[in-house]
C-alpha cells in the first residue's frame, strides 16, 4: 500500500496472554509470500516476543525488531511513539519495498491505544478465558479498534463463558466496526483477519 509514509502499518494490541504474538506469527507466515513484511514488537524490559518470532521462523531475523519500552508499555505506542517510529524508519531503510509493518504492543490494558501517527489500522485481541464480560467493559481497544479479535473460543465451555453474550456485547459496544471470533491455535478465523487487513489497508497482492 503506497501511503505518504510508505508501508501499511498495523498495530496489534491486547492484554497479556490474549494471543497477540500468536496472531503476529500467523500473519507473518500467511502473508509473507504475497507481501514484503516486517514485524516490530514491544516488551517492557526484554525482547522476548521478537525472539519468539525469530525462533518460530515468522520472518527472517533482519525483518523482526524488538523495542524495549521500559516503564509503561502503552506510552511507547501512544504518547511517545518515537522508539517505534524509529524502528519503522529503520525497517524502511533496510527494505525500501515494504508493503506491511506489523507492530505488536507490550501487554496492555483495555485503555491502551495506538497513536494514529504510528498505526494506520489497529487490531485488538482479547480472549475468552479472561471472561465473557470483557466486551461489555468497553475501553478504546474494545470500542474503537478497527478490528476486534475475540480469541480462544475453544476455551468457552471450560471457563463457563458464553460466546453468544460476547458476540452480542461486542456488536453493541462496536456498532458497525467488525469483530472476529477466533481459535488461533488452529488458525480458525485467521482468513477473515487477513482479508480485513488486505481490504481495509488497500494491499495489492504481488503477482
From Swiss-Prot:
Molecular function terms, GO-annotated: GTP binding; GTPase activity; nickel cation binding
UniProt xrefs under InterPro entries: CobW/HypB/UreG_nucleotide-bd, P-loop_NTPase, UreG
Source organism superkingdom: Bacteria
Gene3D superfamilies in the record: P-loop containing nucleotide triphosphate hydrolases
Residues that coordinate or bind GTP: 14-21
Quaternary assembly: Homodimer. UreD, UreF and UreG form a complex that acts as a GTP-hydrolysis-dependent molecular chaperone, activating the urease apoprotein by helping to assemble the nickel containing metallocenter of UreC. The UreE protein probably delivers the nickel.
Name under which the protein is recorded: Urease accessory protein UreG
Organism: Bradyrhizobium diazoefficiens (strain JCM 10833 / BCRC 13528 / IAM 13628 / NBRC 14792 / USDA 110)
